[in-house]
Structure formats: structure tokens, C-alpha cells
Amino acid sequence: MNTNKILETIKMIEEEKLDIRTITMGISLLDCIDPDGEKARIKIYDKITKSAEHLVEVGRQIESEFGIPIVNKRVSVTPISIIAGATNEESYVKFAQTLDKAADTLGIDFLGGFSALVQKGCTKGDKILINSIPEALAITQKVCASVNVGCTKSGINMNAVRDMGEIIKKTAELTKDKKGFGCAKLVVFANAVEDNPFMAGAFHGVGEAEKIINVGVSGPGVVKRALEKVRGQSFDVVAETIKKTAFKVTRMGELVANEASRRLGVPFGIVDLSLAPTPAVGDSVAEILEEIGLETVGTHGTIAALAMLNDAVKKGGVMACSHVGGLSGAFIPVSEDAGMIEAVIKGSLNLEKLEGMTCVCSVGLDMIAIPGNTPASTISAMIADEAAIGVINNKTTAVRIIPAPGCSVGDMVEFGGLLGRAPVMKVNENSSELFAQRGGRIPAPIHSFKN
């Protein structure tokens, strides 16, 4: 062990806000399927609480022994539309309540997997789950929902895209006392991954093991501090600096993942290489882009800087860890990033620029507040645009958007905690109604046929 390396890591944690964003245990619920909904829910509760009973305790032990902050302990489960589909129930809200109760019992921060995978079409269970989302998110505290509406191999399910615009509006309406907060726990995906440790989009894929440990790291502050030391130097040096820094951050993630795996007796899955910001100053992806040379994020050059950042993070992370996965890249959630918030307030960052940025980074339009009177068809069209970016570029994209009831452009919506605050952003007011109402499927792109 090199003493300088140890001191450097301590400095990264104490001064540069390096932390483990989440330890997420994935749990398969396939053995909980039962035609009797009540029995299924008992099995689900018992399986989750038994499997993850030591998750929070082990997380705290590792935090204390290694001195590494672990911000969240989470659980993801098999998409509930698959589990509940065996029942004859007309609503899956009770399943969401069971998940919430299990999360409370465990003392975890979030539980993901109130999900449906409908990229090619909907089963009966998928339709019921999607229709249950608004009420489920309104009456639970820790449950997160996600719906996958497209993938490169199948194209985009435009019926589901149309429906999700309505669902997001209903969710906002049912949680209007919290400015539409329910929508912060709902993600619409294209090319969703099965091993994502981050919320609100985590679910435990059917191709995964019985139980698995996935870890998400966070280190925008560390990358920014490293780049401050190479100001004025070429992009070659910038890329190399980011790569080396990402290596160090990911090494720490792998250490925690392996230790959690060993103590819990659960296999290690992946480390997600994503740079996840927080609302704290100095823990911002936007500030990294500005350190690269932009006056404010959103100006010309933003997409190129973000593309390089994303690629360099992956190159460094892949070298540091034998199993990487999840979303892996740079997150650009507006409400969770102090630099992004500032850029929106200044007027240098708009929705269209954010859309362009999603072409080259991890996810999509994330934690963006829009006026509460935005039509459902416009939200559906936003989802379609993001899904198209993901499907054509063979990458994960997503929409987590909050139509804040009673709010208009320029208002500030406060969510608190890691979710931060979001300035309400202007949306193109021209109608997409006829587009959204067409339905059907947008076919898979020609380059998806690889067999």
C-alpha cells in the first residue's frame, strides 16, 4: 500500500465529497408468484425482509470500518407486473403497499421494481400495473416505478408512450400537495438495464441471480478537483486525468461491493460507473464541464465536453473493476446538480440542449420540472424523442419529468434531500396531440439486426 494513495483517498472523501451513492440488493421474486394475491404479497414481504435483513447494518459497518460514506441502502425486485400478473386483481396498489411496508421494516431508503417491460407490447399484468402507478406512488413513500417502452431490438411501443404521458400527469395530480413529487419516483425507459443500482429506475432482471449486490459510486467533486490541476492543457491531458480519477473512484466502489457481498453472503453483481451529482456545491457534473472550459453549462461545446467526460469515465472504470454495468456514465439531473440549476436560472440551459446532451451520456431528461399545465400529449412526445435517441444509438435513455401542479416557468420546486430543487423549465407550446394519439409501434432500426 502506497501511503500517498491512502492519504489521497482520505482527501477525496473528506474534501471532495467522494462517496458510495448506493448499495443495492437485487432480489428475485419469481418464487413468490401465486394466483392468490394475498398469499403472493405475504411471500413477497417475507422474501424481501429475510433476504435483506442485514443490508442496512452491513452498510453501516462498512461505512464505519472503512471511513467511506455510503449514502443509500436500497433494494430492487423482479418487475411486479410479472409477479402480480398471475392474480385476478384489477389493481396492484396493494402490492406497492407491501413493498413499502418491507422497505420500512428494513430501514432502507428506496425500493425499486414496481415496473413493467412493455417495449413490444403489454400483457394484462403490464396494463394493470401501469394504471396502478399514480395511486401507488401517491400512497407509498419509498416505492419507485419504471416502465420500459422501447429497445433497439424491438423499436418503440407508441401505445405505451401515449399512456405514460397520461400516467405522469395523473401521478403529478395525485401528489400535487408535494408539487408532483410522485413523478420523481417514476422513470420511463428505452433500453432499460437489468442490473441498475440507481433509483428510480432499478429493477431486478429475470436473467439475474436469486440475489445480487450492485453498487453505484459518485465522484463529480473528485473529477473537478483533478481537472483544476491541469487548467489550460490539451484535451488529451483532460481525458487522461478523468480516466485516472475514474479508476480510483471505481476501485473504491469495487472494494465496498466485494466487502458487502462477502458479509451478506450474496454474489457481487456490478459496479455502476455513473458520476452521480448531489445538490451540494462542489458535487456537480455541470461544474466539471465548466472546468473543461465552458463559461456556463448549456453553451456551445457542452455536448462535446460531456461526451469526452462520459467516455473517459468508462475507460477508467472498466480498468478498475472486472464487472461493470448499470447505467455507467455521467448523470445530468437538473434538480440534483447545483451547476445545472444555476445554468437554467441564467437561461443558458434549456430543454432542447438537455435533449442533445442525452445523446452522449448515461440517461436522459432527468428530474426536470415543467409547467403543471403541460398537456399529456407533449409529455408523451418528449418520451418518444428520448426513446428514439436510445433506440437508434443502442443506449439507455429515460425520462423522469415533473409537471409541477400550479407552477409556471421560472418557479422553483423544492423536493429536498438528494432530489434537490428544480426551476420550472419552458416547454415548446406547439401541439404534439395528433402525433401522440397515433399509437402502434415505431419499428426497430435497420442496424439492430445483428444475427
Swiss-Prot record:
What is a single Pfam family found in this protein's UniProt entry? DUF711
- Top-rank taxon of the source lineage equals Bacteria
Xref: Gene3D superfamilies: 3.20.70.20
Question: What InterPro entries does UniProt report for this protein, alphabetically?
Answer: UPF0210
Q: Which CDD domains match?
A: RNR_PFL_like_DUF711
Q: Which family does it belong to?
A: Belongs to the UPF0210 family.
Assembly, per entry: Homodimer.
Q: What is this protein called?
A: UPF0210 protein CLL_A1718
The species this protein belongs to is Clostridium botulinum (strain Eklund 17B / Type B)
